[in-house]
């Protein structure tokens, strides 16, 4: 901070090798804090995950310990055993998907339509949602019933790098009054902002980027080829990288 205060033409930008910018943006829009949400999965009786590999390295957090607590059948007062239900909707098989009670393979674009469909049903809105085949629609209606019946002990998790999808998932959890989403705790493991990173590329294209200083990162390796960061470094007057 002292460096940027002294040199007014310097900008400090953070980026994550695995971008969570969409979640950060959505959380800031919804709750006013640029941070990742945190979930208490030990409170969940019903989990609906759309592309969120939360038993892997999803958002840099470890959820497996909380998850397994409700995956062991527990006897209730009526003598019947109960455990949490987990539905995974995803395009490619993941660690999380392999542990789900039900796994529904679906393309990412269709998963976004599923989120919109669930939200429209819970909000009783009539906005346009693409049609689903009858078999899938029946499954989705049953999922919605389970979300509603479990109420505060249900949660929808979204793993898509898309602001709209993240906001819809947050809104669904608000409608459900989900206590699985922690209201007082957030994760600060990711801070990257894709928009600011894109601005560096634009500054370079406009000829207004004089130099770049990097610390502990390797953007040529970790950023998409479409950003062509290698070309950027080759054409600026000054570049330096501090590494361990």
Residue spans for each PLM region:
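Cofactor-pocket helix-loop regions in the catalytic cores of large enzyme subunits
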Residues: 1-244
